[in-house]
Amino acid sequence: SEIRSLFAVASRPEIVSLAGGMPNLSALPMEMMAGVVNELILTNGAEALQYGSGQGHPKLREQICDVMALEGIRANADDIVVTTGSQQALDLISRIFIDPGDVVLVEAPSYVGALGTFRQYEASVVHVEMDNDGLIPDSLRAAIKSVRAAGRKIKFLYLIPNYQNPTGVCLPADRRTEILAICREEEIFVVEDNPYGLLGFDKPSPNAMRAEDSENVIYLGSFSKTIASGLRIGWALVPQSLKDKLVIASESSILCPSNFTQLTISSYLADQPWRDQIASFCELYKV
């Protein structure tokens, strides 16, 4: 796949890659992380090294609610499913929703890893035009009309509203509201992929789209960019009606996300100045 090829090249020591979305961990204090892991093993190793819940550790899910609150989301921990990175969350959503030949609407251009996932489930990907402010609402209306006129079924709209991959565009608040209104009217779920929302340089990004619509938006989050990508922990915040389906799909795939990495992150969030650490990443990337 394209994403596998990117990471294969990026892993070569002589290459400085700008292609793979790999975070720069030079701002992450390794001694601090070593202390977190050491303390976890000494005080709670039996739980950390055991199987866990297919939905994710309850304490971490509560802490994820606090993280999402920074972007205006009021969430119930029971509606969160912890995954092995948000890429797995996207795979689970695709597995639940997509039948061969179904249409998924995406931005033009869009994240290559998402496109590969949709095509793996034999979806037909329809690109919707963007401009310098992101996805164009009128183009979304036109795409929906065209797809349905051809008798095809749209399963969801996938977009990255904050610092979009690969363009870096941040979707303005008024467009978010308009896009949500269109999708509600047309009864189309929105899959909001938001790994970069807390990494704004000069000003906070607008509130997450999920903050405005809890019934029609499936929100994907990740600690890959705000802590470390190697921990491989993300999550999906879903409408209550979808939660059990997502948990069952995840359990059938991986049984449960790693308790060790979940509790490492939970300890980090509980005991370390994680907001200051995110600010350090922002300053590093700004330079």
Regions found by a protein language model. Name each.
Residues 211-213, 218-283:
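Conserved core segment of the aminotransferase class I/II
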Residues 1-54:
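N-terminal "arm"/small-domain region of PLP-dependent enzymes with the aminotransferase-like
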Residues 42, 47-186, 191, 197-213, ...:
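Conserved core of the PLP fold type I
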Residues 26-28, 90, 114, 167-168, ...:
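Glycine/Thr-rich phosphate-binding loops of Rossmann-like dinucleotide-binding domains
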Residues 1, 280-287:
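Short, intrinsically disordered, charge-balanced linker/junction segments flanking boundaries
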Residues 21-25, 87, 111, 162-164, ...:
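Short, solvent-exposed loop/turn segments at secondary-structure junctions
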